């Protein structure tokens, strides 16, 4: 019995899921030129391939779609310092990625992204790239202005007036507002965050859903998923690597095709609700905690799928 439980927890079941016939996997993604917000989601925060994809797609958008603004699920103020760095500011690339605000970005892949932007700007002084953060979770500055007693009193009153603060709804609402503020300064912007934040549909009003409701935003979203992920995650004060299977029939079909990477146009999918992988900065062994059961055709305009994705290495 113990062995069966171990097998179930490792694979997330006693099979690797279903597959779908007749899917056309492409090697290149074509992003419509009239879109103003192009969003890329990542199924996890702990895999190299999803971080590499940020750079690959951004390069394409710079070269083919005229995009010059990059925005990430990172600290708003810290990313202003990153923007200074890519415009020739002092410091190192590692120091710059640390300013984004989360350890998940302290990787070689993110450093490569920042280096590309800095190098680009050095040779394109009149056509530069800008870097933005649109998250709003940093509140340490409050400690300098208010006592713990004052902060707790204010929070209690605010929550009494607005119960929405007890959920992720407010965070996504403000992230959407921040992206729209960025868009007011830019012709187009490339937005990177977790799948759940950029999706056009979900169990709550996500940033992506709010942005997609306004036609003038020209919202286009690319989701990602994996068949098997060896994911870098925090656990009891350290980083560990754990293996997860998504049970996504699309990625299983990709595996059966012999490819490791494939791109699909979701409008051509003949599937509705399916399992997909979804990991944040935490996990449980039960499959329901790292899988979602949702309709990819409604959530995304396109998807980049991987069979195997490998763990990031966090640089201290």
Question: Model features per residue range: what roles?
Answer:
Residues 2-7:
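Gram-positive cell-envelope targeting signals
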Residues 8-316:
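Structured catalytic-domain cores with a bias toward divalent-metal coordination
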